A protein has these predicted regions:
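Short, conserved catalytic or interaction motifs in soluble domains
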Residues: 18
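N-terminal lobe/hinge region of extracytoplasmic solute-binding protein
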Residues: 35-87, 118
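Surface-exposed binding/hinge segments that line
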Residues: 112-114, 121, 125-155
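Envelope-exposed proteins and targeting segments
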Residues: 28-30, 60, 79, 88-92, ...
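Sec-dependent signal peptide recognition
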Residues: 2-9
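Immediate post-signal peptide segment of exported/extracytoplasmic ligand-binding proteins
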Residues: 23-33
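Aromatic- and charge-enriched surface segment that lines or borders ligand/interaction sites
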Residues: 82-129
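C-terminal motif of bacterial Sec signal peptides marking the signal peptidase cleavage site
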Residues: 14-15
């Protein structure tokens, strides 16, 4: 019986100490291990509405600014490294971080954001978040079909 317990103890110690932890493997191989709960229904940021989908999008998408992870009230730089509010108190100028890149290495551009906001305002897309952009000049008019030229939207 002592031999059995000794062998079992050695087996347990060896099996627990060999190999790499998921964190070590992830760091070495650039893998993010994520416990998301349930499977996402999609990953299109303009369409999805569920919590599992947004957990993924928060991890892979960055806005012009980000919220302070320490709970502060100020916005922090995201893709935009800085921004200014013009005297009219309606127009923001964003200065993009030149190092901001997509996962394929392409540079993130202002046109990417313009395209994204214009797409979100396309009524046939069915985004449930379109009205969040209605504060932008002509956004609601474009969404309602009162104007047809997306370039008239103040993005």
């Amino acid at each position: 019986m002592k031999n059995f317990i000794s062998i079992l103890s050695i087996f347990i110690i060896v099996s627990c100490s060999s190999g790499k932890t998921p964190v070590e493997e992830g760091l070495e191989n650039q893998i993010l291990h994520w416990g998301n709960g349930s499977e996402p229904q999609g990953i299109d940021p303009h369409i999805v509405t569920g919590v599992p989908e947004h957990h993924i999008l928060i991890g892979v998408c960055e806005g012009l600014t980000i919220t302070d992870p320490k709970g502060g009230r100020d916005n922090l730089p995201g893709v935009a490294e800085s921004w200014t509010l013009k005297e009219d108190q309606k127009t923001y100028i964003f200065n993009f971080n030149p190092n901001a890149r997509w996962s394929n290495g392409d540079r993130v551009t202002p046109e990417d954001f313009v395209w994204s906001w214009q797409r979100a305002l396309t009524p046939t897309l069915g985004s449930q978040y379109s009205e969040m952009l209605f504060y932008v000049k002509n956004a609601k008019k474009f969404y309602d079909g009162e104007i047809n030229d997306c370039s008239e939207v103040g993005v």
